[in-house]
Amino acid sequence: AKQMNTDILSKDKDPMGAAILDYQKSGKAGRLRVLSSMFEEDEMPVKHLFRKVEEMPMLEQKALKLAKGKVLDVGAGAGCHALALQKECSTKDASAKQENASEKQDISSVKAIDISPLSCEAMRLRGVKDAECINLFDDHLETGFDTILLLMNGTGIAGKIEHLPTLFNRLKALLNKGGQILIDSSDLKYIYENEDGSFDINLNGAYYGEVDYQMIYKDIKGDSFDWLYVDFPLLKSIAETCGLHGELVAEGEHYDYLARIF
């Protein structure tokens, strides 16, 4: 199996983390620029990373509703998903009124991880109780999760299609028996679609969902990184090669979808 990188980011190469921490501390941030060899320069609205549940896309809200047990939020960023789930944690407080308890989701704990030390600092400031700056592929990461969440294009972490089995096998190793992975992605095919409905895709080239990004914030330049978008049929078939089932939970408005892998 491919050896995945187990590093965390250094603070001087963590533009997104710097933007998140600025926004957390001052309520505003500069432009978080997103560059790619494949697309025009774009920017990521930092405020969006601090979205409340009601501001989240339907697919993310759906994923949060399906979470149960001991939860791991991978690539948690500013912690919006972890915070939302933390509120749902079944309180151990006996004085909590019983009628309230039935409405609560059965979530026992929430752990957020990110390779950005600055993002983890921001999450702790926001009240995420367990935010650890650790790489998903680091052996020191605890195991035994009932739900692993990978949202905002969770397949991205694999980087390339050939690494997706490595990602799935790693997640599988972190799951309890009966556990589930909730992951979202998009089919990028639409980018290559012509007016007549045909597609400009080189079938002998790299998989069309493989892209690269580089982020810049103020004078902080991140390293360029590979990011993977996967269509659902391919995600499902790769999950099956790893001895997992893939289920399409819901589709969004823009070729995006939420999948449950178990």
Residue ranges and their predicted role:
Residues 116-117:
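Conserved SAM/SAH-binding beta-strand->alpha-helix loop
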Residues 127-138:
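Conserved SAM-binding strand-loop segment of SAM-dependent methyltransferases
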Residues 51-70:
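Conserved alpha-helix/loop element of class I SAM-dependent methyltransferases that forms part
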